[in-house]
Amino acid sequence: MSSGAGSFGDPTFGLAHHFSKVPVYGITKLALNGLTVKLARQFKESKIKINSVDPGFTATYPGTETWGARPVSEGAKSVLWAALLPDDGPSGGFFRDGKKIDW
């Protein structure tokens, strides 16, 4: 499970934007995204698909709904999308809501 906080290119949650006061969180997500690319290359010849998924700003902490967090069920859709990719689906990418996010 990744986060837009681990992206240089995500205009909403990217490293240079939202989490600048808590950089460790974004840096750990950036490392996870790098591991995603490495493992996707390692398993390229297999049917295993390895992707990072950002569920978006999701209400997993009490009170975050008032900050505009989406319901957990909405965030889960991104995870299910990635888990159910067909054999010819993408691998080594970073996605939210089934759409690619820039690294």
Question: What is each stretch, according to the model?
Answer:
Residues 30, 45, 52-55, 60, ...:
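C-terminal helical subdomain
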